[in-house]
Amino acid sequence: MLQKIIRLISGTARSSTDRNEINDTGLLYHFRPATNSSIVNEFLKTSYDEKLIDYLRFKTYFLANRRHKQWIPLPKLLRQSRSVRRPIAQASARNQLSLEVEGLPQEQLLVETEDFLVGYANHTQVDELMHEIGRLREIAFRAVGEGSGKSLDLDAYDASYLHLFLWSKTEGRLAGGYRLGLADRIIRTAGVNGLYTHSLFELSSRFIGELNPAIEMGRSFIHPNFQRQAAPLSLLWRGIGEFIVQHPQYQNLFGPVSISQSYSRTSKNLLLRFLKANHFDHRLSQEVHPRTPYRHPQSIPTRNSLRNTPNDLEEISNLISEIEQDNKGVPVLVRHYLRLGAQFLSFNV
């Protein structure tokens, strides 16, 4: 369904008012709509001597970092005292949420299955649902060491954006969401400063001109009860596809995605090098400048220093999982966007 170009810009998933409090590595992306054995298999493809040297250098580097897993610092939010982090707000009454969802116009209900409903609304239509969106954002982001530290994760941008939501019919609760910004409308009323992405990256007029009309995406979350299921994220994307079918003028999608500070610097460096080598739009990246550029040491070896930078997503994910204390691989959203054909444009801190 999404046969259009999708432009994505990655950045930090945090409230704009907390830009100095949470220090995540952000990526700017755009769409067009290793286990040990994997390393060895790659090693066997070409010249024995060259591959042996590259393999040994590469593997030694990552083994050295594994020994220091226990020293990986906790995310900043987890180091905050409990007095700084406010308690999560009380949940909205489910009957009130159900009434708001049922009261939306039929054209705003995009996808329905036996268990779920995907729709969208603006903030004036769904007061209680917006409260629950802010509450669940904060819960989901805190769980990965991010979040605003406030009772609700809501910001000034929410008033001018649409809110895609996933509603669980079986449980009668909000299961997930995305924030969608219709860039042409936002720029017409508030200028480029009205875009959340512009607070993370300086977007040139040429960039805006090439993408517009476009949809800025971000602030995605899945309720913890549904995170182990594949359906919620897929259904949200079906909803995005249906929205584009209804509004075919939007040819491009762009927006920020974050790499949590819970990842070690080694893993982040490896992932960013992989993205720049294999999924980077060098031409369009000239029109985007990070507000706080990510700096990473050039001394980090990539295989074939290193002529053969890994170009397989699963291999990179396996390498990262070897480094990380909790064995996590490439972030879920980054994996999802890459499978949809995303290209990245810039990296921000």
Predicted regions: what is each one?
Residues 1-86, 301-308:
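Non-catalytic C-terminal accessory region of glycerolipid acyltransferases
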Residues 11, 128, 138, 147-151, ...:
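Acyl-donor binding region in acyl/amide transferases
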Residues 33-35, 122, 219-224:
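Short, histidine-centered active-site or binding-site loop motifs used for metal coordination
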Residues 43-45, 346-349:
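Short, solvent-exposed helix-loop connector elements
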Residues 65-69, 73, 142, 146, ...:
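Intrinsically disordered or highly flexible coil/loop and linker segments, enriched in small
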Residues 82-91, 169, 323-324, 334:
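Intrinsically disordered, low-complexity linear regions
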Residues 82-124:
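Conserved N-terminal entry element of GNAT/NAT acetyltransferase domains
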Residues 110-159, 163-167, 173-179:
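Short amphipathic alpha-helix that is part of the acyltransferase structural core
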